[in-house]
A protein has these predicted regions:
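Charged, glycine-enriched surface loops/patches
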Residues: 160-184, 210-220
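Loop/turn elements at helix/coil->beta-strand transitions in domains of secreted/extracellular proteins
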Residues: 87-89, 111-112, 137-142, 175-182, ...
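Extracytoplasmic/secreted proteins, especially bacterial periplasmic and envelope-associated proteins
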Residues: 92, 121, 125, 129, ...
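N-terminal secretory targeting modules
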Residues: 1-91, 103, 107-108, 137
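Oxyanion-hole/transition-state-stabilizing segment in secreted/luminal serine hydrolases
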Residues: 92-93, 98-116, 124-165, 187-191
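Second-shell loop/turn segments in exported
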Residues: 115-120, 155-160, 171, 197-200, ...
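Catalytic His-Asp segment of secreted/periplasmic serine-dependent ester chemistry enzymes
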Residues: 187-263
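A generic secondary-structure signal
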Residues: 132-136, 169-173, 258, 262
Length: 263
């Protein structure tokens, strides 16, 4: 409650609270979630009931309520990057799959390749932060990976046209600033554990076909991670994900060869 009460009101010089420290139970949960092989599910679930884990999620949710686009998530990191004078070669831009990539394959990232993923975000939210988290950093190339949460309707009902418009807007912004664009396919999923009533496979296939065709028309690079991760029926390959949506370390390792083309 103290966090909400301390939230600035109106237009201010610095609307962002101090960075949110990640407590040990959350770090342990993330490590277990990304670990290949059999996972100790009782222990994993017990971590989500740890008071520090619960408090962290509550604080994170409170911040998201006043920062819909997640502009505060990387603001200080961006300021530090710009102040250093180092221009990153590539920005990996996306949702939780991109956010977890930094943990799942840390050797891929560093000063030259940086991650700007935020869990749960739709393409509409990503579009709002595209200038701050991509354009202002002046990278040579940006990889855009979005769509899972649009299909899930994480921020309410939407349409394929809305998704396509958001992708096209980000591409046009990048081109206007001479940033090369890589469009990544939406990874496979037979179901979403947070929206079990949905059958996402057909929409994933349809949107990936559109992404591929749009990339070809616009002279962009299209990276098909779906083909690497998917079974013939469109599910995530067994052993490469705990929840069937987010890759684990083995899943990210399988994506590495394609990811290294983002240069």
């Amino acid at each position: 409650m103290a966090l909400v009460a301390a939230t600035p009101v109106g237009m201010v010089d610095d609307p962002c609270p101090p960075p949110l420290a990640v407590p040990e139970p959350v770090r342990t949960f993330n490590a277990m979630f990304l670990a290949p092989g059999k996972v100790d599910m009782p222990r994993l679930l017990a971590l989500t009931k740890d008071p520090a884990y619960v408090a962290y999620n509550a604080e994170k949710t409170a911040r998201e309520a006043t920062d819909w686009a997640g502009l505060c998530r990387y603001r200080r990191d961006n300021d530090a990057t710009i102040a250093s004078g180092r221009r990153p070669k590539a920005v990996f831009f996306g949702d939780s799959i991109t956010e977890a990539w930094v943990l799942g394959d840390p050797d891929l990232f560093g000063d030259a390749v940086i991650g700007r993923g935020i869990g749960g975000q739709t393409s509409a939210q990503m579009l709002v932060r595209f200038r701050q988290d991509v354009i202002d950093l002046k990278p040579r190339v940006v990889q855009i990976l979005a769509g899972t949460n649009d299909i899930a309707g994480n921020r309410g009902p939407t349409s394929e046209r809305d998704y396509q418009n958001n992708i096209m807007a980000m591409v046009e912004l990048a081109k206007a600033h001479r940033i090369k664009v890589v469009l990544a396919s939406i990874p496979p999923a037979a179901t979403f554990i947070w929206k079990p009533e949905l059958i996402p496979g057909p929409k994933i296939a349809r949107l990936n076909a559109w992404l591929r065709d749009y990339a070809r028309r616009e002279g962009l690079t299209y990276l098909d991670y779906h083909a690497v991760l998917a079974t013939p029926d469109g599910a995530m390959r067994k052993g490469w994900s705990l929840d069937g949506v987010h890759p684990n370390r083995d899943g990210y390792a399988a994506m590495r060869a394609r990811a290294e083309r983002v240069r």
